[in-house]
A protein has these predicted regions:
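The feature captures the beta-strand-to-loop junction immediately N-terminal to the Walker
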Residues: 36-38
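Helix-to-loop junction immediately C-terminal to a conserved catalytic motif
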Residues: 51
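Conserved ABC transporter NBD signature motif
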Residues: 59-67, 76
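Conserved ABC ATPase "signature" region
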Residues: 100, 115-133, 158
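Conserved ABC ATPase signature
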Residues: 111-112, 137-141, 145
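Hydrophobic anchor residue at the start of the ABC signature
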Residues: 151
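Catalytic Walker B motif of ABC-type/P-loop ATPase nucleotide-binding domains
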Residues: 162-166
């Protein structure tokens, strides 16, 4: 079975300076892969590079044997969702609105949601036990609730790959 996601001799870093070199990963569909290391070791930098948020220094990232840099943003968003540790700060959006942004790769130019999109949004909220906060402003919920909403947004994309950077950070103990 060929890997769904691969990196080949990937070098990552900032301002053209490679901090980590020769990263080679092969991730099979349906598998969970973790990057473990101390703070500051480059795990987030590797993840940001894999998903295209940070330019690579050298090497290749392949998704379904296609080079990531040849895929459109829409194609990438249909294949891959990401939840990073950086917090988003949407103004005037409810939690449902934030989750619904996960459907944008599947909508038309105006981003209007169809009935199926609305069903997927609700199902994603329910999967993370966040239905009761769906209509609350995103800015008015706890960090743990925000993390659940961001996880719901990733699920709402219905991607083949979900990249999570410290996914349990901010989660409330009682949930």
């Amino acid at each position: 079975m060929s890997a769904y996601l691969q990196t080949q001799d990937l070098s990552v870093g900032y301002d053209g300076k490679a901090l980590i070199q020769n990263v080679c990963l092969e991730v099979q569909k349906g598998k969970i892969v973790t990057l473990i290391g101390p703070n500051g070791s480059g795990k987030s930098t590797i993840l940001k590079t894999i998903v295209g948020q940070l330019g690579k220094i050298s090497g290749t990232v392949l998704v379904e044997n296609a080079a990531m840099d040849r895929l459109s943003r829409r194609e990438i968003a249909q294949k891959m969702a990401i939840v990073m540790t950086e917090r988003i700060h949407p103004e005037l959006m409810t939690c449902r609105d934030v989750v619904a942004t996960g459907r944008y790769p599947y909508t038309g130019a105006l981003g209007l949601l169809g009935e199926r999109d609305k069903e997927v949004v609700q199902a994603s909220l329910d999967r993370v036990d966040a239905g009761e906060i769906a209509e609350r402003p995103f800015s008015a919920i706890s960090d743990g609730q925000r993390q659940r909403i961001l996880l719901a947004r990733a699920l709402c994309q219905e991607p083949e790959i979900i990249v999570l950077d410290e996914p349990t950070s901010y989660l409330d103990i009682r949930y």
